[in-house]
Amino acid sequence: KTPDYCTIDFGDGYSVSLTATNGTVSPSNITVGYGESASFTVTPNSGYKLELETNTCGGTLSGNTYTISNITSGKSCSITFKSSTPTLYAKLLTDKTKRPNRGSFSSILTSNNTNTLYTSIENGTTVYYFAGNAQDNWVKFGKNASNQDLYWRIIRTNSDGSVRLLYHGTSTTATDAYIGTSAFNSSYDNIAYVSYMYGSTGSIANARTNQTKSSTIKGVIDNWYTSNLEAKDYTKYLSRTAVYCNDRSTSDNKYFGARTRLDTNKTPTYDCATIEDKFTADSSTGNGKLTYPIALMTADEVSFAGGLYENNAPTWYYYNSANGSSTGDTWWWLLSPDYWYGGNAHVFVVGGSSYPGYLSFSYVIGTHGVRPVISLKSCVKTSGGDGSASAPYTIEETETGC
């Protein structure tokens, strides 16, 4: 029998509302007909990203458009945006809220501190650094050839936004936080032997020209790098534009720039005046001579961190997390030339437990510890931690490094 009645719906359609936790929605309510779709413009708040943690109505997200399809009844829906993972650089600035003025560099700075960053300038850009006995500049990043986790201390940020790290071995309590011992150069009787790389001998001008020869210590560092960080595919996380300064400037062919700044004037700098002394892996910011983006800490960086020429200074670069020497009794090399005199080339070093954090110099043929320095790219993200020894910052591993 054919039905003799029909039902007519005079309603205005189905009401669909949407709320967003950690973001905004526009409009908040839409009315649609049977079987139609409702689309909303959604925007995450700062610190959150266009990915959903909760999605009560099963809608789809494409860019900033959230769509609920095939609507057959009224709905009240909600979504929650995921927290975005901050870069290590951004996390540092968020966590370290104290910005004291370092002031004079004429005395050591060894006091304990947390949540503290000091500011300076590199190439006209504000950079941030740790000083004194900072307790919260620990990073866990990478593994060595034996698959052991590697630990580092944050030295500072760089003008390219990368974060500079000092090697601390395979634990925060390490007393052997160096990759081995080495001479800086195997010969000492030429001014060129203060160079990390050089062309020929006889003068600094010669050393700076056609720099194809590696120092002894650079060979040690590069070999370690290829066997460990490169072999484990960590190169993609490292800045190629960060500058490692082997400052060979000299006005008298005796004392080099860092010696004058730190001994006479007490005025450290992060700037590197001469392009040939700016060791980089990318030629856009320096000499582009490094095959691998890794080198050493500078004497100026030690001064910023609390050190003082020819003084003990047990600061963060000296200590491990157990408040002992991170290198035991072993002194360790810096990248900065000190002086050339009496037929002997000298480079800066830092003292071990017998001379805690003592900033001094050594003949380049001396045997001292090698503590590599790397810089994590500005886009590298942290996956957790607060920088303490018990919860070091960890790095989010990705396909591209960012």
Enumerate the predicted regions with their spans.
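Short proline/glycine-enriched turn/loop motifs at strand-loop junctions of beta-rich domains
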Residues: 13, 21-22, 45-50
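Well-ordered beta-strand positions in beta-sheet-rich domains
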Residues: 29, 65, 76-78, 151, ...
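Small-residue (G/S/T/A) turn/hinge positions that recur once per unit in extracellular repeat modules
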Residues: 21-26, 30, 56-59
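Conserved "repeat-terminator" motif of extracellular CCP/Sushi domains
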Residues: 1-16, 64-84
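Surface-exposed coil/turn segments at beta-strand junctions on protein surfaces, enriched
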Residues: 11, 33-35, 45, 61, ...
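Long, domain-scale functional regions
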Residues: 2-11, 83-402
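Surface-exposed interfaces of beta-sheet-rich extracellular modules
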Residues: 1, 36-67
